[in-house]
Amino acid sequence: MLYLIAEWLGFEGALNLIRYQTFRTGATLMTALVIGLIIGPRFINMLRVRQGKGQPIRDDGPQSHLAKRGTPTMGGLMIIVSLVLSLVLWMDLRSPFVWACLAVTVGFGLIGFLDDLDKVTKNSHRGVSAKVRLLMEFLVAGIASYIIVSQINTWLYVPFVSDRAIPLGPFYYVFAAVVIVGAGNAVNLTDGLDGLAIMPVIIAAGTFAIIAYLAGRVDYSEYLGIPHVPGAGELAIFCAAIMGAGLAFLWFNAPPAAVFMGDTGSLALGGALGAIAVASHHEIVLAIVGGLFVFEALSVIIQVFWFKRTGKRVFRMAPIHHHFEQLGWSESKVVIRFWIVSIVLALMGLATLKLR
């Protein structure tokens, strides 16, 4: 909104700063952070009053988690509100990428909200059926993919290799939707410990802020040999909003958590990262930067497949973070070590920009 107003006024005087994406990226991060810190306590109190028992805690999970009973969930609402308000304020709202990513964020957030609401209402950890949830997710992702792909080509670019791209044609629409849905659910599976999911999301968003900015610049993209995506620079501002809102949420989610983001937040943030990766044409890089989320999702897939096939478990408990808890690692040790892994993976992802 401010960008359009400043443009209408001719970017006169101090308004000229708003012309630059780098300035708006920093301003968006700070705005989302401040909004989140201001509304956080009110949101948490409201959720605590309305939910009563809070998020249901599984009896068959780690026994240390039983102490978390009564902690409110749906904290993802404050993330989404902080993110959306800061974006409306600072982004160029004419960008189709903005609306596609916003559609995924809000749409997936709504799906997660319905899932959380069902869990809280029924005091059960099951929520909405997986088939119904996936159907709704693919519907939202399909719409967003259509908007995004109308602005970019349908080639899949391979990192670490010069001038190597795979033409997917119409199948790219399906591929894009799978990336978005997969990212949303991978982050959702990672969100099982205080602070575990939100910091890797912040790290991934920071990494993609750099990638999106570079992809949006003709000079940098040509120098690095990465696909140039006109208008992708605005996605750096979207990433900054995720970072700011995420940091504000972490303030309240730090152990012991005062609130859980729930499926409302994890699906929204994961889906947003997937949409940003598709729009910036760095889908494979997302699998590297978000490798922790991939690892968590694979641990569940492997556990379920192997148990159905043999009746035995590969891990003591899935997702994998619970396996390490069962090995005797404290929750804080699991969380911090997984954060370290996320930082290393982010650096590896950035290395793909130059290593050919």
From Swiss-Prot:
Keywords: Cell cycle, Cell division, Cell inner membrane, Cell membrane, Cell shape, Cell wall biogenesis/degradation, Magnesium, Membrane, Metal-binding, Peptidoglycan synthesis, Transferase, Transmembrane, Transmembrane helix. Its EC number is 2.7.8.13. It holds the Pfam family Glycos_transf_4. Its main location: membrane. The keyword Magnesium applies. It catalyses: UDP-N-acetyl-alpha-D-muramoyl-L-alanyl-gamma-D-glutamyl-meso-2,6-diaminopimeloyl-D-alanyl-D-alanine + di-trans,octa-cis-undecaprenyl phosphate = di-trans,octa-cis-undecaprenyl diphospho-N-acetyl-alpha-D-muramoyl-L-alanyl-D-glutamyl-meso-2,6-diaminopimeloyl-D-alanyl-D-alanine + UMP. It is a multi-pass membrane protein. It is found in: Cell inner membrane. The chain crosses the membrane at residues 27-47, 73-93, 97-117, 138-158, 165-185, 195-215, 232-252, 258-278, 284-304, 333-353. Coiled coil: none annotated. One of its GO terms (cellular component) is plasma membrane. GO terms for biological process: cell division; cell wall organization; peptidoglycan biosynthetic process; regulation of cell shape. GO terms for molecular function: metal ion binding; phospho-N-acetylmuramoyl-pentapeptide-transferase activity; UDP-N-acetylmuramoyl-L-alanyl-D-glutamyl-meso-2,6-diaminopimelyl-D-alanyl-D-alanine:undecaprenyl-phosphate transferase activity. Its cofactor is Mg(2+). Pathway: Cell wall biogenesis; peptidoglycan biosynthesis. Catalyzes the initial step of the lipid cycle reactions in the biosynthesis of the cell wall peptidoglycan: transfers peptidoglycan precursor phospho-MurNAc-pentapeptide from UDP-MurNAc-pentapeptide onto the lipid carrier undecaprenyl phosphate, yielding undecaprenyl-pyrophosphoryl-MurNAc-pentapeptide, known as lipid I. Belongs to the glycosyltransferase 4 family. MraY subfamily. PANTHER family: PHOSPHO-N-ACETYLMURAMOYL-PENTAPEPTIDE-TRANSFERASE (PTHR22926), PHOSPHO-N-ACETYLMURAMOYL-PENTAPEPTIDE-TRANSFERASE HOMOLOG (PTHR22926:SF5). This is Phospho-N-acetylmuramoyl-pentapeptide-transferase. It comes from Erythrobacter litoralis (strain HTCC2594). The gene is mraY.
